[in-house]
């Protein structure tokens, strides 16, 4: 899951980025309001963590512009503004959730997962395809009921494909979902991850659509 984080507090921002990255999220972090606002137009983010008190542009104005321009990515407001009227205003401007500081990182992760379930119309964290089960919240994968060991990028790729079962995902989109701007990406990175997953799940689990990208095979 690729997350856009807009937070000007260096200690908080670094803690969120580091912690979520260890949990398997890909996080792009911006400290300036306007830069963060423009970033959403440049990459396919799954969700946004947005502070309200930002240099350059207030978080409420950022959110208002996004919604007016049709950006529908789920937004979690994370702020020290805890007054009832502030929370109500944020939600009415188009935020999908509102969490006040101080916070526990595990709750931030849980709320992001809940936003993704809501976006995808899912009632449970568990994703299933054939005899493969994936629980992104618990970072658990099983094959025919047996534990499956996956590297972080393999887990992220499998989650992406399972969340989009029935769709062909272009290679470029997969690359953008798996990697942040500050990560080096080799030209065959996606192909390598697909190869490793096929070795663990079976050669037919992921199907190549030549000239386009990848999709899950038949169940």
From Swiss-Prot:
Keyword Transcription regulation in annotation: yes
Any single Gene Ontology cellular-component annotation: protein-DNA complex
Modification(s) after translation: Phosphorylated by QseC.
Domain Response regulatory, chain residue ranges per copy: 2-116
Matches recorded under Gene3D superfamilies: 3.40.50.2300, 6.10.250.690, Winged helix-like DNA-binding domain superfamily/Winged helix DNA-binding domain
Keyword list, A-Z: Activator, Cytoplasm, DNA-binding, Phosphoprotein, Transcription, Transcription regulation, Two-component regulatory system
DNA-binding region listed in the record: 124-218
Coiled-coil annotated spans: none
In-chain residues carrying the UniProt-annotated modification 4-aspartylphosphate: 51
CDD domains attached to this UniProt entry: REC_OmpR_PmrA-like (cd17624), trans_reg_C (cd00383)
Pfam family, one: Trans_reg_C
Main location class: cytoplasm
GO biological process: one example: regulation of DNA-templated transcription
Organism superkingdom: Bacteria
Keyword Transcription regulation: yes
Any one GO molecular function term: transcription cis-regulatory region binding
Conditions for induction: By the AI-2 quorum sensing system.
Compartments reported by the entry: Cytoplasm
PANTHER family: REGULATOR OF RPOS, TRANSCRIPTIONAL REGULATORY PROTEIN QSEB
Function: Member of a two-component regulatory system QseB/QseC. Activates the flagella regulon by activating transcription of FlhDC. Currently it is not known whether this effect is direct or not.
Protein name: Transcriptional regulatory protein QseB
Annotated organism of origin: Escherichia coli O157:H7
Gene (UniProt): qseB
């Amino acid at each position: 899951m690729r997350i856009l984080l807009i937070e000007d507090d260096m200690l908080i921002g670094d803690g969120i980025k580091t912690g979520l990255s260890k949990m398997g999220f890909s996080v792009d972090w911006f400290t300036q309001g306007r830069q963060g606002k423009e970033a959403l137009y440049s990459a396919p983010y799954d969700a946004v963590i947005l502070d309200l008190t930002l240099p350059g542009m207030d978080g409420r104005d950022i959110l208002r512009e996004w919604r007016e321009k049709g950006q529908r990515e789920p937004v979690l407001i994370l702020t020290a503004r805890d007054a009832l009227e502030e929370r109500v205003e944020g939600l009415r401007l188009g935020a999908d959730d509102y969490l006040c500081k101080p916070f526990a990182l595990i709750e931030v992760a849980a709320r992001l997962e809940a936003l993704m379930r809501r976006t995808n119309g899912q009632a449970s964290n568990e994703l299933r395809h054939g005899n493969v089960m994936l629980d992104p919240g618990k970072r658990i994968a099983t094959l025919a009921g047996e534990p499956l060991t996956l590297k972080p990028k393999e887990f992220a790729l499998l989650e992406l494909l399972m969340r989009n079962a029935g769709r062909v995902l272009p290679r470029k989109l997969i690359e953008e979902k798996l990697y942040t701007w500050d990560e080096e990406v080799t030209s065959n990175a996606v192909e390598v991850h697909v190869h490793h997953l096929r070795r663990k799940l079976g050669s037919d689990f992921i199907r190549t659509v030549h000239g386009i990208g990848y999709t899950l095979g038949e169940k």
